[in-house]
């Protein structure tokens, strides 16, 4: 592990209102697990996504996994297409793999 916090860095670049929306959604998942598919969806191989609709009608995604019983945010992005880009999935899977090794 590198000690970097790429999701936190990404969030800090967003407008404050978007940060709050995404933060609330992550907290709902973290403290209300399990939650419904509208907010959280499995992506396979231990990877999940938090789905946030921002005020600007943009869609944000935070990809996460569990490590040592804790939810760990692995990658985040603004969704631009209906299907999650393979590159985004690969980044999250690699980070999850690095944590497990």
Kindly give the residue locations of the regions a language model identified.
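Hydrophobic/aromatic beta-strand elements that line small-molecule binding cavities or substrate pockets
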Residues: 62-63
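Basic, Lys/Arg-enriched alpha-helical interface segments
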Residues: 1-59, 68-71, 78-101
């Amino acid at each position: 592990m590198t000690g970097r916090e790429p999701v936190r860095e990404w969030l800090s670049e967003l407008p404050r209102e978007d940060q709050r929306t995404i933060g609330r959604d992550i907290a709902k998942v973290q403290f209300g697990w399990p939650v419904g598919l509208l907010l959280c969806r499995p992506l396979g191989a231990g990877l999940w996504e938090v789905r946030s609709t921002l005020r600007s009608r943009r869609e944000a995604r935070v990809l996460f996994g569990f490590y040592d019983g804790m939810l760990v945010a692995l990658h985040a992005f603004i969704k631009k297409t209906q299907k999650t880009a393979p590159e985004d999935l690969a980044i999250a899977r690699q980070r999850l793999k690095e944590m497990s090794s």
